[in-house]
């Protein structure tokens, strides 16, 4: 399955509050931070809303497991 590599290239100073929340939802905190996310329509929609703040590319790597998968693995 494909994944999306997202990088925050601009700071959040001066941007609207909803865009800050979206960037936080993508898991990006500081400028130049990078995150590997699953290739879903929801992720692409979030990226589209803050496209002026981020750079992204599709990569051939497995996205990190979700929260439920990590919890199940920790219990085993």
UniProtKB/Swiss-Prot annotation:
The keyword Transmembrane does not apply. The lineage of its organism: Bacteria, Pseudomonadati, Myxococcota, Myxococcia, Myxococcales. InterPro entries: Ribo_uL30_ferredoxin-like_sf, Ribosomal_uL30_bac-type, Ribosomal_uL30_ferredoxin-like. Part of the 50S ribosomal subunit. One of its GO terms (cellular component) is large ribosomal subunit. Gene3D superfamilies: Ribosomal protein L30, ferredoxin-like fold domain. This is Large ribosomal subunit protein uL30. One of its GO terms (biological process) is translation. The keyword Ribonucleoprotein applies. The gene is rpmD. Keywords: Ribonucleoprotein, Ribosomal protein. GO terms for molecular function: structural constituent of ribosome. Belongs to the universal ribosomal protein uL30 family. NCBIfam families: rpmD_bact.
